[in-house]
């Protein structure tokens, strides 16, 4: 009896008796969350009640749609490397998060989504606003769970944050029934330090480093293609050191952009469907292809049967399931890019490949002449998307974070934006989610208020989450919004022109007065239709201390080149 | 380059988690791979479940799928094996009219010859149980079908592998961290 009393006393000292909903908020705060994005509703109201009480410690951003909350959490995570948090009610609130969750899954973005759920005694009864969100979100989450007991809340949230952030990051959803929110528990928060069935970072085999280094040291025409794994692994410096020591030309996937400054002499540009001419073409000329933290997406490789067949492939990745998934590797190096690249650095000989690098420069000159010149220094009457990017570069000096949506403007933004700082290219890569940029830019700006955040969006994608202008206004988020308006769903129209005999089925848009809409939300707004107005308008936007909307009316039927037609070989990249 | 499609037994050691079956079956579904049979039970390790899944696919795909299964947070380890690398059995039950047992003496011979076991007998029916390879069960079903079967049911494959599974070591290594 005596020992029992002592034990009870000890427990009382360490824990607090609180409600499940308070435990949710306290668990989030224990994970260092000071901002979250969401939308209230019936099944999550107890949590909102607690958020009201703790509003001086944790800032809830009311988005105008749950999809906006999920993308804002993504933008927050992508620019900061921290876990983004979104919160929604059951039923439609939860299902509206799904697009953002799927986007985070395919782009390996750490977010935690908390959803309210109907009381546990109603589960399975088709109750009001009941959906099986755990079932729905299973294929698009790294992990998910449903909590029906108050006392399980802290552990579930601890596990959620650990899983979202560790190893290859990803989205996690925790669904919490309303009775678990109302119930009480003895609260004590312990961060999750490990899960026995889960190995976040596989061990790097020293032999694989030796084998990789040997291939690279003996290569005449080595080429690196890096992806977001470098950014997620915080291996930017290690990548740069490897490239410089071995003198290897290095290209990036869309999500790898900004890990190495644009101006770096060994940065040879973007690979993939609308990537640069040289790295695409020379993928089929190199003798060793070193893939780092990238997953050989079909938009990168084109036809796999003709992809880098002449080359030895070295694949660095944290995720064993990526090895040999699309492209068979000769050497696979598992592990965290920061550590494996540091080991590789030690094993590499100092080297240079000047004549090989010149091949890239020569092809760049061709691309410049045939594509880039016309994009950024156009002589025709209509404005181009490329010249808008050029003006933004002039004003940002390469220091802005560029948040792009999906389509032609995205390809132009990723091709032409200058980046000096890592984690600066925030875009929906794998899922290609139109509507991503506006809310993601809000999250990015709130995570990094000192940075300039420029959202570059097409007129189509802008209208998919245009309601988030309300969030920008309410939060005073100083996001700069550029809509490149060609009155078309441009990328689809481009495909219709090239592959569907110009049958422009449902791609032409009759657009509203975008300036009036922005002004309706009390956001400063400007519209540019002539070249001579562009520089001044971009300057004004970038100098603004508040959010600013700039619509640029660009040429209606411009195409993005280079282009690897779907299913063609990387070496068949077209310049026109 | 066209690789042969073979039968593979996929063994998965997992935590006992309510949603995991969904996660695992979704990985097959995405690639349009039909699950021939699926069994789940306790494994040799307390608190660890084991899935035994039989699928027909190429070895390249088996390898990719096993890695995608192993990637799931609550999967401890996943393996694939060919039929030759495993010892496997299925089990089945027949419900048959009791009168036949007395009227058709051949039935008694069939039961004896194929090592089937009578689980229960009552006035209306008797229940026969048999474990073995698919072809043995199929041949028994054909033999009994002549006389009429009231109900037939066959389980999924259960299998143990000839080589060692290093799951216990992995769990111990985690505990000793």
What is each model feature region?
Chain A
Residues 2-348, 352, 391, 395-398, ...:
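N-terminal alpha/beta PP-like core and its mobile active-site loop of ThDP/TPP-dependent enzymes
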Residues 173, 315, 403, 456-457:
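Generic enzyme active-site microenvironment
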Residues 175-180, 407-409, 555:
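A glycine-rich phosphate-binding loop feature that marks nucleotide/adenosyl-phosphate handling sites
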Residues 114, 122, 128-129, 324-326, ...:
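Thiamine diphosphate
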Residues 2-15, 151, 189, 310-406, ...:
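Phosphate/pyrophosphate-binding active-site segments
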Residues 227-231, 377, 458:
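Conserved short loop/turn motifs at secondary-structure junctions
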Residues 21-25, 29-34, 42, 47-52, ...:
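Active-site diphosphate/adenylate-binding microenvironment
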Residues 39-41, 60-71, 86-93, 148-149, ...:
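Active-site nucleophile and cofactor-binding loops and adjacent substrate-binding regions
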């Amino acid at each position: 009896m005596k020992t029992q009393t002592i034990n009870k006393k000890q427990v009382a000292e360490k824990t607090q008796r609180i409600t499940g909903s308070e435990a949710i908020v306290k668990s989030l705060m224990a994970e260092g969350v000071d901002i979250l994005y969401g939308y209230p509703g019936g099944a999550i109201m107890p949590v909102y009640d607690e958020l009201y009480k703790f509003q001086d410690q944790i800032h809830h951003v009311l988005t105008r749609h749950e999809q906006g909350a999920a993308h804002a959490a993504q933008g927050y995570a992508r620019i900061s490397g921290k876990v983004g948090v979104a919160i929604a009610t059951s039923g439609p609130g939860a299902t509206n998060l799904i697009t953002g969750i799927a986007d985070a899954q395919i782009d390996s973005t750490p977010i935690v989504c908390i959803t309210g759920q109907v009381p546990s005694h109603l589960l399975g009864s088709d109750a009001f606003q009941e959906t099986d969100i755990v079932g729905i979100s299973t294929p698009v989450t790294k992990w998910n769970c449903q909590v029906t007991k108050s006392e399980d809340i802290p552990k579930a949230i601890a596990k959620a944050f650990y899983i979202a952030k560790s190893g290859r990051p990803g989205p996690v959803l925790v669904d919490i029934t309303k009775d678990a929110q109302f119930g009480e528990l003895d609260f004590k928060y312990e961060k999750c330090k490990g899960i026995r069935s889960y190995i976040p970072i596989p061990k790097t085999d020293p032999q694989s480093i030796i084998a990789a280094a040997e291939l690279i040291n003996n290569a005449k025409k080595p080429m690196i293609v890096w992806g977001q794994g470098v950014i997620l692994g915080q291996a930017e410096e290690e990548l740069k050191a490897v490239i410089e020591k071995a003198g290897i030309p290095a290209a990036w996937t869309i999500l790898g952009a900004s890990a190495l400054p644009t101006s770096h002499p060994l940065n040879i540009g973007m690979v993939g469907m609308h990537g640069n001419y040289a790295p695409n073409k020379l993928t089929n000329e190199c003798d060793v292809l070193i893939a780092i933290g990238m997953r050989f997406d079909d938009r990168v490789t084109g036809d796999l049967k003709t992809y880098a067949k002449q080359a030895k492939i070295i694949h660095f990745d944290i995720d064993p399931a990526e090895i040999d998934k699309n492209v068979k590797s000769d050497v696979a190096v598992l592990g965290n890019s920061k550590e494996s690249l540091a080991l590789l650095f030690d094993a590499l000989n100092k080297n240079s490949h000047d004549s090989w690098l010149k091949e890239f420069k020569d092809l760049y000159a061709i691309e410049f002449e045939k594509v880039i010149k016309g994009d950024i220094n156009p002589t025709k009457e209509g404005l181009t998307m490329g010249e808008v990017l050029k003006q933004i570069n002039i004003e940002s000096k390469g220091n802005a974070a560029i948040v792009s949506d999906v389509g032609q403007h995205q390809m132009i933004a990723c091709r032409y934006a200058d980046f000096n700082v890592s984690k600066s290219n925030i875009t929906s890569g794998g899922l290609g989610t139109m509507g991503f940029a506006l809310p993601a830019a809000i999250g990015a700006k709130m995570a990094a208020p000192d940075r300039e955040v420029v959202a570059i969006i097409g007129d189509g994608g802008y209208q998919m989450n245009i309601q988030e202008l309300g969030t920008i206004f309410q939060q005073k988020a100083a996001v700069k919004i550029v809509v490149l308006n060609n009155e078309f769903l441009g990328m689809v129209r481009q495909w219709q022109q090239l592959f569907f005999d110009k049958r422009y089925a449902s791609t032409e848009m009759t657009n509203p007065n975008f300036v009036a809409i922005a002004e309706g939300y009390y956001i400063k707004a400007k519209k540019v239709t002539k070249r001579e107005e562009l520089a001044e308008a971009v300057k004004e936007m970038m100098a603004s201390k508040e959010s600013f909307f700039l619509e640029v009316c660009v040429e209606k039927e411009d195409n993005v080149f280079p282009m690897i037609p779907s299913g063609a070989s990387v070496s068949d990249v077209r310049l026109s | 380059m066209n690789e042969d499609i073979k039968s593979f037994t996929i063994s998965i050691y997992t935590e006992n988690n309510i949603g995991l079956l969904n996660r695992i079956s979704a990985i097959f579904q995405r690639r349009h791979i039909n699950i021939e049979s699926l069994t789940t039970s306790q494994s040799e390790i307390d608190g660890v479940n084991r899935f035994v899944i039989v699928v027909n696919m190429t070895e390249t795909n088996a390898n990719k799928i096993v890695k995608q299964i192993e990637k799931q947070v609550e999967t401890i380890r996943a393996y694939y094996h060919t039929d030759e690398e495993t010892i496997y059995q299925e089990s089945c039950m027949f419900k048959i009219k009791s009168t036949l047992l007395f009227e058709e003496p051949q039935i008694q011979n069939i039961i004896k010859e194929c090592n089937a076991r009578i689980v229960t007998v009552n006035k209306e029916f008797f229940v026969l149980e048999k474990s073995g390879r698919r072809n043995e069960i199929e041949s028994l079903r054909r033999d009994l079908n002549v006389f009429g079967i009231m109900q037939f049911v066959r389980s999924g494959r259960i299998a143990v592998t000839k080589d060692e599974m290093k799951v216990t070591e992995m769990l111990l290594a985690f505990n000793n961290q």
